């Protein structure tokens, strides 16, 4: 383990459109097939909700080490549909629903 402070080791920022497949691969590693977000749904999330999709990029190798993503909504209860329908994101929504927290092992 490096003695570097976490902010020295990783860059934290919003995901870029061209990183959707890398995020989908991390999702595949972190979750069983029946729970992992598909490539299509991951691309939809990145395209429609990039403002709530944060990544950690390892500065030593330039690769994504993990990510956190969600969507905003006025709903107060997490719905299964949020995981498969990025169009349910309401940028003005008062609540943020966490859809995934993925970190490579």
What positions do the PLM features span?
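Short loop/turn microsegments at loop-to-beta-strand junctions
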Residues: 11, 51-52
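Active-site acidic-Proline motif in GNAT/NAT acetyltransferases
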Residues: 104-105
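Short loop/turn motifs at secondary-structure junctions and domain boundaries
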Residues: 44-49
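Cytosolic beta-strand hydrophobic patch enriched in CBS
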Residues: 53-58
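A short beta-loop-alpha structural element at the N-terminal edge
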Residues: 9-22
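Conserved acyl-donor/pantetheine-binding loop and adjacent beta-alpha core of acyl/acetyltransferases
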Residues: 63, 67-101
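Helix-loop element at the rim of GNAT/NAT acetyltransferase active sites that forms part
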Residues: 14, 24-38
């Amino acid at each position: 383990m490096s003695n570097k402070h976490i902010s020295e080791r990783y860059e934290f920022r919003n995901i870029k459109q061209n990183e959707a497949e890398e995020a989908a691969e991390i999702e595949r590693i972190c979750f069983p097939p029946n729970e992992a977000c598909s490539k299509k749904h991951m691309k939809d999330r990145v395209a429609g909700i990039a403002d709530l999709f944060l990544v950690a990029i390892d500065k030593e190798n330039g690769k994504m080490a993990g990510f956190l993503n969600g969507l905003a909504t006025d709903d107060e209860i997490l719905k299964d549909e949020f995981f498969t329908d990025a169009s349910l994101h309401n940028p003005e929504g008062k609540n943020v629903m966490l859809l995934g927290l993925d970190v490579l092992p």
